[in-house]
Amino acid sequence: DNFPHLAVTKAGVARIEDRPPLIYHFDTEATKDYKIHAHSAFANYRGSLLPERRALIESYMLSDIAFKVVGVGSVGTFCAIGLFMTADGEPLFLQVKQALPSVLEKIAAPPPGLSHQGCRVIDGQRAMQAASDIFLGFTEDQKTDRHFYVRQLKNRRLGSIGEVIEGKALDAYASLCGRTLARAHARSGDPALLAGYMGKSEVLDDALASFAMAYAAQTKHDHAQLKAANDTKAGLARK
């Protein structure tokens, strides 16, 4: 979980190994000053943790930081990973991701006390998750006035299980995902209000199924276009 394969030692200093184009350092003219901002941002991040977790993170020092390419939901935002080390050489990777304003702010003002976008994100995660990341926190870059949330870098995901799961078990897996999502929303909202909105008919069920099918069709269409563009580019490169 601590990604030891990403940590290398150079001249006695632990650094993140470049894995371009997915992981790379701030070496260009446009990004050279981000590391200085990152040290300040991570210092502010510690203050967002609960006291007992703050004491734990204090045993780590920021050793290196690098850009990390993540999922499509974060395209166009600042995403990086920080390598923290203890005095005896134990690594900890934290991920810092830019938090943008909620789309709901276009129609309604944010609740009092939630003007910090990173704080808003982690409050939602803590409400929806039965057990959240112990290092989940938030910070900001005061020079650019951008907000971020911070969490541990994870390499254990269940999303890819759908690619290898047996057909007979897929229905049970989908049901488990649905129950988990429903439980999360019930934790973060009013269960009675949600139940009343959904009703007892199959209208919502049909709407969700229709959305899922349309989303799958759009994904296939987008992938076909991406593959065609990639094949065209590869053909031009060979010429």
Predicted features and spans:
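Conserved ATP-binding subdomain of kinase catalytic cores across diverse folds
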Residues: D1, A43-K239
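ATP-dependent kinase catalytic cores of phosphoinositide-metabolizing enzymes
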Residues: D33-H39, A43, G47
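General structural signal for secondary-structure boundaries
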Residues: Y24-Y34, H116, E166-G167
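Internal, well-ordered alpha/beta segment that forms a basic, Gly-enriched binding/recognition surface
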Residues: D1-T31
